[in-house]
């Protein structure tokens, strides 16, 4: 299935490329990519295929010079345009050949997972005043992702949310990374629980601050 070229926010681009948000911002601040791959107005957004070149730029930092990476990006951009073309895109000369196929598969998989995560979440004014929830439930997606971030074992998370599957929990984590919670974080609401055991990491933080 062809992935449609669309716009990604900085956080979505970070998820798709497998890099950090500061690295994503560097791409624009340092004008690393051709300008038609991103926009800065009204907000910073990227074309979907930019995620592949962002991943390439950072993943090859230890093996290629900055100039070599920039030249490869320019040459690849001239040869490949559609997402399917990027799969077999190859650039180089008699001294160096760069094939994007393996990296394309990784980015393509992340993009598909991101699409699945988006499709799993709904925002309905009639459900928790529009709080993003997992489709078919009233479970806030960011609450589930917070448990993953806190390193709560998946078995415990599934006990807290018996209506969810392990796959949905994984997608919740992806969604939260791509679409961070707006405003002040909500207090976690865990079904059927009045006391929540804290992770070792949280316990350590509490003891240090006592």
Model-assigned labels for residue ranges:
Residues 2-23:
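Polyanion-binding surface elements
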């Amino acid at each position: 299935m062809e992935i449609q070229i669309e716009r990604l926010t900085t956080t979505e681009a970070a998820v798709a490329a497998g890099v950090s948000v500061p690295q994503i911002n560097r791409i624009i601040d340092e004008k690393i990519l051709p300008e038609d791959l991103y926009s800065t107005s009204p907000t910073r957004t990227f074309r979907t295929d930019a995620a592949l070149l962002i991943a390439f730029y950072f993943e090859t930092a230890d093996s290629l010079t900055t100039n070599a990476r920039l030249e490869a990006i320019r040459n690849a951009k001239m040869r490949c345009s559609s997402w399917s073309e990027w799969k077999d895109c190859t650039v180089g000369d008699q001294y160096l050949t760069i094939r994007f196929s393996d990296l394309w598969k990784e980015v393509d998989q992340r993009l598909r997972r991101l699409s699945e995560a988006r499709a799993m979440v709904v925002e309905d004014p009639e459900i928790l005043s529009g709080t993003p929830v997992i489709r078919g439930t009233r479970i806030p997606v960011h609450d589930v992702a917070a448990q993953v971030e806190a390193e709560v074992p998946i078995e415990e998370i599934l006990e807290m949310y018996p209506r969810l599957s392990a796959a949905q929990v994984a997608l919740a984590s992806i969604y939260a990374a791509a679409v961070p919670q707006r405003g002040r974080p909500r207090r976690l609401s865990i079904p059927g629980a009045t006391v929540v055991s804290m992770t070792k990491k949280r316990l350590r933080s509490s003891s240090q601050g006592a």
